[in-house]
Amino acid sequence: MDGSGTGSRSGVESILPNYKLGRTLGIGSFGRVKIAEHALTGHKVAIKILNRRKIKNMEMEEKVRREIKILRLFMHPHIIRLYEVIETPTDIYLVMEYVNSGELFDYIVEKGRLQEDEARNFFQQIISGVEYCHRNMVVHRDLKPENLLLDSKCNVKIADFGLSNIMRDGHFLKTSCGSPNYAAPEVISGKLYAGPEVDVWSCGVILYALLCGTLPFDDENIPNLFKKIKGGIYTLPSHLSPGARDLIPRMLVVDPMKRVTIPEIRQHPWFQAHLPRYLAVPPPDTVQQAKKIDEEILQEVINMGFDRNHLIESLRNRTQNDGTVTYYLILDNRFRASSGYLGAEFQETMEGTPRMHPAESVASPVSHRLPGLMEYQGVGLRSQYPVERKWALGLQSRAHPREIMTEVLKALQDLNVCWKKIGHYNMKCRWVPNSSADGMLSNSMHDNNYFGDESSIIENEAAVKSPNVVKFEIQLYKTRDDKYLLDLQRVQGPQFLFLDLCAAFLAQLRVL
């Protein structure tokens, strides 16, 4: 027990009656972490106690809420588990998985560069966890050894989702965040990015650190560091195996559109070597996991006094209560203790459901096989590699971007749509049905005007306040096969009006 006062201790224990609190594991900027024991099962947990006032003073409410939202969703052997959230007017209590072997960062500092098999084992676990995030439309954006925790068996647990973002179809992120040494060039440059590819870059930096004991991009001078990252300037030590020397450069490609994807990493010969059975297939999504209930553990929880029907309904609906917390604590600790480390759960999914092809993973923005990957060292993967997609987001064209944008502006003018330029190939738009062109806008359609610094828009206040106003964004981006994709995303307004507008917009275009 720590030295906190009896009054505060009894207060906390009244809020957490199902746990026996132990010592303080650490103290942070807006809270502390205590070890605790779940009363019914005896399993250890870590309880984060976050002070609401400190969170608000540090303007960290959004970061904390984001992490809670994401961790509540996730069930994966290599992502830290959140079992329960208890809120009071003064504090937020997060009951989380307890891991006791520190950070991967400290492990690397202590051991230096790792043997290839050990590094590969860590990397396989990291990629599995990151792939699970992407399948659930979450980009971590701050992957680094400091955010990778180790349990007693040296299994990786991805933590700290405070900087993560939920991905939305057709929407691009532009928030620069994360640690500079691990951040992708497009992130530190403030460019638009779809998400998954920035995690791939960070994983490449982590793999380099595991195998080399140093960082590929490092400089005390931040401008020099950014210059190295933007230029992709680093050296590969001679001790690396041919497989590692092939994979790392594929991950540390400056152009995100040419960077290897998670499905392609999975199929790389170096990654495939000694791949554990439970990591050999993509993990089930959260919906599949909620439907699958372990009958033996269910009965064990029922024997503790919980109602069977209520427990099953709560598990299927992912409802947090004493019964479901008890169930998941037993489930996780049982599989963790087994030699397969959750292998049984993943194997059951593999055998009980159709195998999802790696190409179905979230990839950014359009997934295609990289040329040369299958020819590496003469290894023929045949049907294992991701098949090229038959579909893509948005409207495709091989026309020049300037020509495309000029036609877009002409179509917007014909449809009486207001637009505001955000970047050369990104704009915000507003449309009100049955509004005249004179009342809505006065746009110059000369292409030099669009590619200049001005946004050509003059609006009518009455039109802006219309209940039928439709707001949307237009984004043009380049694909790997030298085509261009034009994507429209509704931001606000009636869905059917937006679809009508899209149909009319498509009919107006001459280059797509």
Curated annotation (Swiss-Prot):
<dbReference type="GO" id="GO:0042128">
    <property type="term" value="P:nitrate assimilation"/>
</dbReference>
<feature type="cross-link" description="Glycyl lysine isopeptide (Lys-Gly) (interchain with G-Cter in SUMO)">
    <location>
        <position position="34"/>
    </location>
</feature>
<dbReference type="GO" id="GO:0005829">
    <property type="term" value="C:cytosol"/>
</dbReference>
<keyword id="KW-0418">Kinase</keyword>
<keyword id="KW-0443">Lipid metabolism</keyword>
<dbReference type="GO" id="GO:0009789">
    <property type="term" value="P:positive regulation of abscisic acid-activated signaling pathway"/>
</dbReference>
<keyword id="KW-0539">Nucleus</keyword>
<dbReference type="InterPro" id="IPR017441">
    <property type="entry name" value="Protein_kinase_ATP_BS"/>
</dbReference>
<keyword id="KW-0723">Serine/threonine-protein kinase</keyword>
<dbReference type="GO" id="GO:0006979">
    <property type="term" value="P:response to oxidative stress"/>
</dbReference>
<feature type="region of interest" description="Auto-inhibitory domain (AID)">
    <location>
        <begin position="290"/>
        <end position="389"/>
    </location>
</feature>
<dbReference type="GO" id="GO:0010228">
    <property type="term" value="P:vegetative to reproductive phase transition of meristem"/>
</dbReference>
<dbReference type="GO" id="GO:0005737">
    <property type="term" value="C:cytoplasm"/>
</dbReference>
<feature type="cross-link" description="Glycyl lysine isopeptide (Lys-Gly) (interchain with G-Cter in SUMO)">
    <location>
        <position position="63"/>
    </location>
</feature>
<feature type="modified residue" description="Phosphoserine">
    <location>
        <position position="164"/>
    </location>
</feature>
<dbReference type="InterPro" id="IPR000719">
    <property type="entry name" value="Prot_kinase_dom"/>
</dbReference>
<dbReference type="GO" id="GO:0009594">
    <property type="term" value="P:detection of nutrient"/>
</dbReference>
<dbReference type="GO" id="GO:0009507">
    <property type="term" value="C:chloroplast"/>
</dbReference>
<keyword id="KW-0963">Cytoplasm</keyword>
<keyword id="KW-0808">Transferase</keyword>
<dbReference type="InterPro" id="IPR028375">
    <property type="entry name" value="KA1/Ssp2_C"/>
</dbReference>
<keyword id="KW-0444">Lipid biosynthesis</keyword>
<dbReference type="GO" id="GO:0106310">
    <property type="term" value="F:protein serine kinase activity"/>
</dbReference>
<dbReference type="InterPro" id="IPR001772">
    <property type="entry name" value="KA1_dom"/>
</dbReference>
<dbReference type="Pfam" id="PF00069">
    <property type="entry name" value="Pkinase"/>
</dbReference>
<dbReference type="GO" id="GO:1900055">
    <property type="term" value="P:regulation of leaf senescence"/>
</dbReference>
<keyword id="KW-0275">Fatty acid biosynthesis</keyword>
<keyword id="KW-0833">Ubl conjugation pathway</keyword>
<feature type="cross-link" description="Glycyl lysine isopeptide (Lys-Gly) (interchain with G-Cter in SUMO)">
    <location>
        <position position="390"/>
    </location>
</feature>
<dbReference type="GO" id="GO:0009738">
    <property type="term" value="P:abscisic acid-activated signaling pathway"/>
</dbReference>
<keyword id="KW-0832">Ubl conjugation</keyword>
<feature type="binding site">
    <location>
        <position position="48"/>
    </location>
    <ligand>
        <name>ATP</name>
    </ligand>
</feature>
<keyword id="KW-0276">Fatty acid metabolism</keyword>
<dbReference type="InterPro" id="IPR011009">
    <property type="entry name" value="Kinase-like_dom_sf"/>
</dbReference>
<keyword id="KW-0067">ATP-binding</keyword>
<feature type="domain" description="KA1">
    <location>
        <begin position="463"/>
        <end position="511"/>
    </location>
</feature>
<dbReference type="GO" id="GO:0003006">
    <property type="term" value="P:developmental process involved in reproduction"/>
</dbReference>
<feature type="domain" description="UBA">
    <location>
        <begin position="292"/>
        <end position="332"/>
    </location>
</feature>
<dbReference type="GO" id="GO:0005794">
    <property type="term" value="C:Golgi apparatus"/>
</dbReference>
<keyword id="KW-0150">Chloroplast</keyword>
<dbReference type="GO" id="GO:0000152">
    <property type="term" value="C:nuclear ubiquitin ligase complex"/>
</dbReference>
<dbReference type="Pfam" id="PF02149">
    <property type="entry name" value="KA1"/>
</dbReference>
